[in-house]
């Protein structure tokens, strides 16, 4: 049976897991690490770098290194003002108002989906090697508070990476699956998920294999990146006070500050004070400047106090929506690396009057849960029923620019709802359906998921035509909308792919490009390996010549020496076919030498005197 992997596509790091022998297991990447940085870069020669190797070169290549891309996926340019200012690469707006990421070395704009697909591709290629079979099917997680277009965009990223994405599952729900797989007693759990770029709170009731989401709340503009940014801003201010130089204008310095801030934040989870040392951070006419600064936990908590306070609101909202008191919560599960921050753990404890459960790995639990969901879909795991909800209300714009809700937030999915609407003016022959997502009263204040037209309505006084609008949400939380005029039966339907996601043609084009690039990358890797083999053969052949110089025929010696010289020349000029031919020729010649030497040794052994020995028993 084909394996279905679970992928946690994170803002900072990503993880892939699979069900093996009835137990979920995290799959290490090709470098042997269990988490992979969600970082993609292009080198000056056009080579694609993904993961740890991309992260390591970010300081010297800030404009071509793309990180925290999850904060842009499925969003319009106008929605990312704050996030745009936090990255060192260029984020552009296309004619449709969508987000594009510019790569100077390639002189090309990429969509966030394309960049995310490279991370997914790295994970699945590593998993394919690890499992010994090609991975084509996956369950991918998203923050519970992701809207429809962000979910669709994540699914598109999976498609571009060559995957059949069987299910999009909410991260806190996945975490609850991992936590509650073997739980038999009924429990109400609160999943507090603070990742690199998003924050979710989900309350579930679990027991006897049923995982029912009672409510979800969150903030898709809050995560570990924001905590790093507070430290970076403080360092920039401190440096400006000391040297009157604004480091925020220097991309390379800003990248170094960001890395140092992340490192300091992580260290302050286990120590009370850390040192930030940045030699040669910049230079003046008087010479280079080194930056050294101490940061203690108290100062860090002061810097991020506003962010910590923001974490309380979704907790309160989730309890209110689930109609529960904090005393009703049996367990608190912490998810995401940012939950290691002591101030966050204290906030959770104070807000819910309970110590959080520390038995799950916050970095891996989401991918593990996604792998369990994959096993459920594959039929490997039975007796598990997952009842998730839509995180935000869905509706249409009606007369006066009002949002009329059709499916309230926290409705269990999949679900379907139909309402009858009519025309606003006499003899109206078409209607435009404007689909919205959000909790505000006015249409303009909510997220627009798209519009479509229903034509062919028979002319009639306003209010007479009956237009049946049906909202259908699937198990992925992705919406389809149908509008039908009841008299004529005229119908128009659309899967809301979100105004900022890609259409089918674009996806197919990007998939083809990704496949071509993947083939080119494989070819580059094969060529590098071929050159490495050739270097080894040159070294070994030369060693053999030096070692047996006196025993080798002079003509043969000269022939091999010439072949080695030609092979070295072919390596330096990248003549790959010639490299293969010369490698073969050298191997053939050195084998002949080996045979001749062995033959001579055998003759010498036969002709040598044989010494008889007498043995006596002792």
Curated annotation (Swiss-Prot):
Keywords: ATP-binding, Chaperone, Chloroplast, Nucleotide-binding, Plastid, Stress response. HAMAP family: DnaK (MF_00332). Acts as a chaperone. One of its GO terms (cellular component) is chloroplast. It comes from Cyanidium caldarium. This is Chaperone protein dnaK. Belongs to the heat shock protein 70 family. It holds the Pfam family HSP70. It is found in: Plastid, Chloroplast. The gene is dnaK. Its main location: plastid. It comes from the Eukaryota. GO terms for molecular function: ATP binding; ATP-dependent protein folding chaperone; unfolded protein binding.
